[in-house]
Amino acid sequence: MTDTQVTILAAGMGTRLGRPFPKPLTPLDDGRTIMQQQLDNISQAFGTGTRIQIVVGFKLDLILEAAPDAVFVYNERFDQTNTCKSLLKALRASAPGPVVWMNGDVVFEPEVLKRLKLNIDTGQTAIAVNTSAVSDEEVKYTVNENGLVKELSKTVVGGLGESVGINVIAASDKAALIKRLDECDDQDYF
């Protein structure tokens, strides 16, 4: 089994929620924040020694206080860039090997991460998906005849479902993804 490292993208301002704190610190019904649920799920799926890296920006001190044992990557342009540039910074700062990365606002069950372990262990890049009906806001996907992702974006027509915002990038694919993210505009989503 490969040592697992997880990156949480938490630099954004979350302006659509209209709250005075980062979106990952939104409280859930069980009393935890979204980020605390993510951290708990990561520990449950991968163990307590998992390297967790969090990309911070907006009100970064609040995120640092919420996850003091994490490694932090600062996106100093958080108010001018979207997630592609935060992910780029994170991948450049990551340790060798595969990276599980997720958006800081994803609420999920630990089983999602446990299912991705096979991809991690076999060196496969993967995205977690939901095959329910999708709307314009979601990141949608299509697949080719071999079942591999063909298209992945908010503008996909005829999407089979949505990418839920939890992904694995294999070590062998990391350099290519870094190159593509470097080519993206500041306002692009991944």
Q: At which residue positions do the language-model features occur?
A:
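Hydrophobic packing residues within well-ordered alpha-helices of enzyme cores
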Residues: 17, 63-64, 177
